[in-house]
Amino acid sequence: YLLCGVALFSNVSIALTNIFLVPLTLVFGLRLYKKRDDWRRALPGGWMNISLGVLLAVLLVVSLFSPEMLRSMWIVLDDFGYRMLGMYAVLLFVRERRRLAVIALCALISYTVNNIVLIGQGVFLGNLRAAGFSFYMIVGSMLSMVTPVLLILLLSGRIAPPYHSVVMGAFAVSLPAIYYNGTRGAWIAIAVTLLITCGILIRRKKKFYIAVFCSGITVLGLCMVSPYLSERIASIGDMKMQSNTERICLWTSAFHMFEDHPLTGVGRGRFRSEYRDHYILPEAKEGALPHAHNNLIQMLAECGIFGALALIFFWGSFVAHGLRLWLRRRNPMGLVLLAVMMGFVLHGMTEYNMGHTNVVKFFGLLLGLCLAWIRADDEKECCV
């Protein structure tokens, strides 16, 4: 029930999500205290366990060299502990696919409700950076992770009839939400993720190429009737646009932090103060920015080369697991896991979505649902 509550409010309210997440944390800790051997089940398994352990170890070690050692360590534990609790809790507590489906349905309801509100803001208020109950960059990450997943589930033909119409409706709502949200980084992340995952899933490549062509024609037609859309797409490569030039300034400053502290970085959670006080470029127009608008560059600046490599290893282990599952067993959940990872990582190339607590919580929940479903499939095969 607590996991259903977390899922149901995951896209709507941080406060309401925490009402369920805090007691879930207590129940999770109590379960591990009473049944100490269960900690293995709460972990994703295989190389993903190793990569998670390496990432935590590296980030905690480099935090020892941070000017704010305790604060940096706390941020590390919060990032990959409390915020990712959804993954650990789903893996520990939920074994039946029926219950996993209920939690996933709650998450889908939350996602769709926010998208409906977002579309209403766009249609009736003329808001072309609409966000529903949230912030437009946060919604961009949610759309990047979920939209490809919905299409993969529809194309795989593995959804039970009662849920098929629900998934179809959620996907249909996602499309105008993508438009009215207006996050360019999310548009790129969704397009690339769909191209790769659907290209892998669809065996008849002729159908895939026709679908890509028709999608391109549709987008071109929308650009012709919507000046906003055409201008927004054209602005992606416009180096005179402030949001683009500001990102270049941020990335340059972050690289300077890395040059000065190549091994351990400036300290986890210290980007804002270091950027403002020491590394802001003269041409930068926004001096109080708290992050680098890029997950990997942020990690490189704050935790050095070791932190960045550990993060790549962590991401790569999940991507490899998804690909391996599809290639060996043709299990669509492998591509679902791949889509979640790609959506999060690709949107994180233009936004520091690791810094948005509700994005990371939702990301962890999605990973937990994917991995628990895969584990349930494995256990069923073993029983047979």
Positions of predicted regions on the chain:
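Long extracytoplasmic/lumenal interhelical loops at the membrane interface
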Residues: 238-252, 264-303
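Transmembrane alpha-helices of multi-pass inner-membrane enzymes
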Residues: 23-31, 212, 333-349, 353-384
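Membrane-embedded alpha-helical segments of multi-pass membrane proteins
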Residues: 15-34, 77-88, 138-147, 188-195, ...
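Transmembrane signal-anchor hairpin modules in multi-pass inner-membrane enzymes, especially those
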Residues: 1-75, 95-99, 105, 153-165, ...
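Loop-to-helix entry and N-terminal half of a specific, functionally important transmembrane alpha helix
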Residues: 1-6, 170, 290, 323-350, ...
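Alpha-helical transmembrane segments of multi-pass inner-membrane proteins
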Residues: 6, 57-60, 85-89, 95-126, ...
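A membrane-periplasm/extracellular boundary helix in multi-pass inner-membrane enzymes
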Residues: 176, 180, 201-243, 250-260, ...
